[in-house]
């Protein structure tokens, strides 16, 4: 039995930081179906690390490349991430409050506030901190949620270390 994987670049051009993970799993799972005498044909840009990893049957090679890129870009698993989604006007106030907490050292100085990104009437703020400072960020966000709940205000959507950062 042989396997043909078409349009490899399309799989990797998804706006999701986990795309390469899924592609690596799909490629190696598909290639594992090849039987004696069969071939695996991959239609993919030849310079991509996944091609070298698949050719040498070494998935750790592609994983290592992925992790190196994430380290350089300060992405998970090297940082903790939280996303907060709520009404657009409120997210601006929340971002201001979080920036003030950073300035006053109530949140780690390495906390990054990304966004907000607005879709419709809701906006999402992405927060990242080094793994070592993750508990401080999470405690602050849980306190924010507790206070909103006590004040009977609408609770935002809070995701800690979400699987995906895209909507």
Task: Pin down the residues of each PLM region.
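Accessory helical-bundle/CTD segments and flexible terminal tails appended to RecA-like ATPase motors
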Residues: 1-18, 32-167
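Amphipathic alpha-helical segments in well-structured domains
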Residues: 20-24
């Amino acid at each position: 039995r042989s396997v043909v994987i078409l349009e490899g670049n399309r799989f990797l051009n998804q706006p999701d930081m986990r795309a390469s993970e899924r592609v690596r799993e799909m490629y190696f799972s598909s290639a594992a179906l090849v039987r004696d005498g069969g071939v695996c044909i991959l239609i993919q840009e030849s310079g991509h690390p996944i091609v070298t990893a698949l050719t040498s049957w070494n998935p750790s090679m592609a994983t290592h490349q992925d992790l190196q890129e994430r380290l350089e870009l300060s992405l998970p698993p090297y940082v903790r991430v939280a996303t907060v989604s709520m009404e657009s006007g409120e997210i601006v106030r929340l971002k201001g409050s979080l920036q003030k907490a950073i300035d006053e050292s109530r949140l780690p100085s390495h906390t990054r506030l990304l966004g907000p990104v607005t879709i419709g009437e809701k906006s999402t703020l992405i927060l990242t901190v080094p793994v070592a400072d993750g508990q401080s960020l999470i405690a602050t966000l849980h306190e924010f949620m507790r206070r909103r709940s006590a004040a009977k205000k609408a609770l935002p959507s809070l995701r800690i270390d979400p699987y995906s950062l895209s909507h």
